[in-house]
């Protein structure tokens, strides 16, 4: 069992949607740092060397910072032309309808045209892109530049598969149209709470959080079990958490249509997020070890 250290005050204080860390920032950094614990030594050396050679200035070039690169790249022109947003936004999620999930419809597994790199090829969901980038990272023919892009996208997209609100939709734009509050705090969206607020209660510094979670995985000896499966399996697992907990345990609506999250919902959500961070870190490491191992 993973170690949980929940501060009692977390269910008494207000959960305010003020910080913009989101899974895009703090969560991604935590997951990358967890993965760093489990990289084979030779693979870690390759990862560090590839990132050190990165000339892009959007982020720093340590593994935690590079885990945010795909989001920063996507959002560069969000308020202008939105060309990057239009091309890559669907790469970060899998929109499975809560009442009738259909993986084949959500992820159609398009084939990359011959000679087309994964960074330019078609895909309609995160599962497809993870599979494409993992294959490219292990390729003997892909250029160094394309392999670097594959690594940077994997650092981000594997994490996205494990955020329950990124792989589910209840006709509410993935939780963006559902307003909630906790402990009497100001309303925010359900997606924001799962993106950011619940993670914030684990702490402010991603490294000690990642170290603690990785230590919990070691003590529980669950790495091998966690690392099994495919991106599709992991997506359906996260979808189950969305259906059973994120949506399934919401209280009755208030008269204004929003939800007041009870203390047990908040506590359980933080524990669920912690588990998903662990799973994502372990599985990211497994993908990188496979793609950049003896055959990578």
Feature roles, as predicted:
Residues 21-157, 164-296:
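N-terminal, motif-rich segments that launch catalysis or mediate targeting to/interaction with membranes
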Residues 5-15:
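Bacterial N-terminal signal peptides
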Residues 17-19:
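N-terminal signal peptide c-region/cleavage motif recognized by signal peptidases
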Residues 4-5, 25:
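Absolute N-terminal positional cue centered near the fourth residue
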């Amino acid at each position: 069992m993973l170690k949980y250290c929940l501060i009692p005050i977390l269910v008494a204080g207000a959960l305010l949607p003020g910080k913009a860390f989101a899974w895009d920032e703090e969560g991604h950094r935590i997951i990358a740092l967890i993965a760093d614990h489990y990289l084979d030594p030779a693979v870690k050396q390759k990862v560090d060397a590839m990132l050190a050679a990165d000339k892009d200035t959007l982020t720093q070039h340590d593994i935690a910072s590079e885990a945010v690169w795909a989001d920063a790249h996507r959002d560069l022109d969000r308020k202008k032309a939105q060309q990057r947003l239009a091309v890559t936004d669907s790469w970060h999620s899998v929109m499975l309808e809560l009442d009738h999930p259909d993986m084949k419809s959500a992820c159609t597994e398009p084939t990359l045209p011959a000679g087309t790199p994964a960074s330019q090829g078609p895909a309609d969901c995160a599962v497809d892109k993870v599979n494409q980038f993992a294959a490219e990272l292990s390729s003997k023919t892909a250029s160094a530049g394309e392999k670097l892009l594959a690594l940077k996208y994997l650092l981000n997209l594997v994490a996205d598969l494990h955020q329950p609100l990124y792989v589910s939709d209840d006709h509410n734009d993935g939780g963006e149209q559902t307003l909630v509050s906790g402990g009497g705090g100001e309303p925010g969206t359900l997606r924001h709470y799962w993106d950011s607020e619940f993670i914030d209660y684990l702490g402010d510094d991603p490294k000690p959080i990642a170290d603690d979670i990785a230590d919990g995985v070691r003590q529980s000896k669950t790495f091998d079990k966690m690392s099994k499966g495919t991106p599709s399996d992991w997506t359906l697992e996260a979808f189950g958490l969305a259906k059973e907990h994120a949506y399934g345990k919401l209280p009755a609506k208030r008269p204004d249509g929003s939800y007041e999250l009870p203390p047990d919902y908040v506590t359980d959500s933080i524990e669920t997020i912690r588990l998903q961070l662990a799973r994502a870190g372990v599985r990211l490491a497994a993908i990188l070890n496979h793609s950049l191992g003896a055959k990578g």
